[in-house]
């Protein structure tokens, strides 16, 4: 399995403030890594490092300069007074050929949105259009920054199903970022919990047979969603300092 991006003990400091400390991770073709963490954990900074938009203060990043990356941003801010159809929005990407737009939208089941105004789309529809735009360069790595933000549970299940299909079709690596600390995509190969440093990592615990989970999401939801249980040996105080836990759960 080929390695697309490798981060080795990277740290990022802005002035006297350390944003990321000693982060190591590997993104591989055909595998999904979900990055979890609360607001302010450094997730967006880490994404910028992976995308090559920010150089780490220390540590090393190994990435093929020709690596094709498809990026779906966390938020899309559009002027509500600006007439902009999905077709025109897709063409704003440099080098896009008009004949490639409809096939990309079809891949994400959004061909019917081609001439719809971007400002009128629902959260789930917007995410599908952004995914289609990210596919235009045949990516080897998909970076999805909170792709289910503003999308209801049914929409989340549909998006997760779609992301898995795209992973299989393109055999691309996927880095997915989320602030939901307990609900992640069941097809995730690895979960990495971040709070300035790597708090914990591992595979998600699939709870597809749990009666409460099935009652909430049904069998289809159980196939697409999973709960990840965190096992930390520490917590963070209000200043972000690490407080180690003793055995039995008390702080050291």
Curated annotation (Swiss-Prot):
Gene: znuC
One Pfam family hit: ABC_tran
Protein name from the UniProt record: Zinc import ATP-binding protein ZnuC
Subunit field text: The complex is composed of two ATP-binding proteins (ZnuC), two transmembrane proteins (ZnuB) and a solute-binding protein (ZnuA).
Function, in words: Part of the ABC transporter complex ZnuABC involved in zinc import. Responsible for energy coupling to the transport system.
Membrane topology listed for this record: Peripheral membrane protein
Family of this protein: Belongs to the ABC transporter superfamily. Zinc importer (TC 3.A.1.15.5) family.
One GO term describing the cellular component: plasma membrane
Keyword Metal-binding on entry: no
CDD domains tied to this protein: ABC_Metallic_Cations
PANTHER family reported in the protein's UniProt record: METAL TRANSPORT SYSTEM ATP-BINDING PROTEIN TM_0124-RELATED, ZINC IMPORT ATP-BINDING PROTEIN ZNUC
EC id: 7.2.2.20
Transmembrane segments: none
InterPro entries in the cross-refs: AAA+_ATPase (IPR003593), ABC_transporter-like_ATP-bd (IPR003439), Metal_Ion_Import_ABC (IPR050153), P-loop_NTPase (IPR027417)
Catalytic activity: Zn(2+)(out) + ATP(in) + H2O(in) = Zn(2+)(in) + ADP(in) + phosphate(in) + H(+)(in)
Alphabetical list of PROSITE patterns matching this protein: ABC_TRANSPORTER_2, ZNUC
Subcellular localization: Cell inner membrane
Residues covered by the ABC transporter domain: 5-220
